[in-house]
């Protein structure tokens, strides 16, 4: 899979590509990351890419032309604008994007984009209801979430029991040695060796954690915790 990232700050992505799972995926040939500085496509003096807002307003807006020209350089990709106004990114969307051979993520900066940029992308995505200085961190977040789903990047089945996978609930609590730490004990059922009981406990714990931390997830579901 190829992921293009349009950014005014390509240096942000250097360490990101050189560490952990992303570096391994690139080395094995499962993933290609192509960072494009869309300032290089500016026709303005001094490669200017922003200007004042029509109708008045604070800050500067990114101009449509350099972004459009940069997008034209990756014609076969599925193009995504990163902005707070977009649909909120989630695991379901990560699976959808992982089906594409090539995607392009457009990172904003300053006060945002000229609205006409939307005419040259396929979709607009947000990573949450908060404001960041630029789209670089959201681009890394989406890149990692999508890359993990590309065949060959992770061991088969290694992501299937994580939060938001399978039944869509949060992951169940997990423990390792020691069995007791400062009086805090690992649940006895996990030490029992009874896999049927362990499986049931994990389903109950997953549901309880989701009920406590993410009621919004349960609001979207109709089934009970032990149905299926």
From Swiss-Prot:
Gene3D superfamilies: 3.40.1280.10, tRNA(m1g37)methyltransferase, domain 2
Subcellular localization, as worded in the UniProt entry: Cytoplasm
GO CC field: cytosol
Residues annotated to bind S-adenosyl-L-methionine: 108, 127-132
Top-rank lineage group of the source organism: Bacteria
Pfam families in the record: tRNA_m1G_MT
This enzyme's EC code(s): 2.1.1.228
Reactions listed under catalytic activity: guanosine(37) in tRNA + S-adenosyl-L-methionine = N(1)-methylguanosine(37) in tRNA + S-adenosyl-L-homocysteine + H(+)
Keywords: Cytoplasm, Methyltransferase, S-adenosyl-L-methionine, Transferase, tRNA processing
Keyword Transcription regulation: no
GO biological process terms on file: tRNA N1-guanine methylation
Record's protein name: tRNA (guanine-N(1)-)-methyltransferase
Species in which this protein is naturally found: Metamycoplasma arthritidis (strain 158L3-1) (Mycoplasma arthritidis)
This protein's encoding gene: trmD
């Amino acid at each position: 899979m190829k992921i293009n990232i349009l950014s005014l700050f390509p240096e942000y992505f250097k360490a990101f590509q050189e560490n952990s799972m992303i570096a391994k995926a690139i080395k094995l040939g499962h993933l290609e990351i192509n960072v494009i500085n869309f300032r290089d496509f500016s026709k303005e003096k001094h490669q200017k890419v922003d200007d004042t807002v029509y109708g008045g307003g604070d800050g500067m807006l990114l101009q449509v032309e350099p972004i459009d020209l940069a997008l034209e350089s990756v014609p076969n990709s599925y193009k995504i604008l990163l902005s707070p106004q977009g649909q909120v990114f989630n695991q379901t969307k990560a699976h959808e994007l992982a089906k594409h051979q090539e995607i392009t993520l457009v990172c904003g900066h300053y006060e945002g984009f000229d609205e006409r940029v939307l005419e040259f992308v396929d979709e607009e995505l947000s990573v949450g209801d908060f404001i960041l200085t630029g789209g670089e961190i959201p681009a890394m977040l989406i890149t990692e979430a999508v890359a993990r789903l590309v065949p060959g990047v992770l061991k088969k089945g290694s992501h299937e029991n994580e939060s938001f996978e399978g039944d869509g609930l949060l992951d169940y609590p997990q423990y390792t040695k020691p069995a007791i730490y400062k009086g805090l004990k690992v649940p006895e059922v996990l030490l029992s060796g009874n896999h049927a009981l362990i499986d049931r406990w994990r389903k109950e714990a997953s549901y309880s954690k989701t009920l406590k931390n993410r009621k919004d997830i349960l609001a979207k579901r109709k089934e009970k915790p032990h149905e299926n």
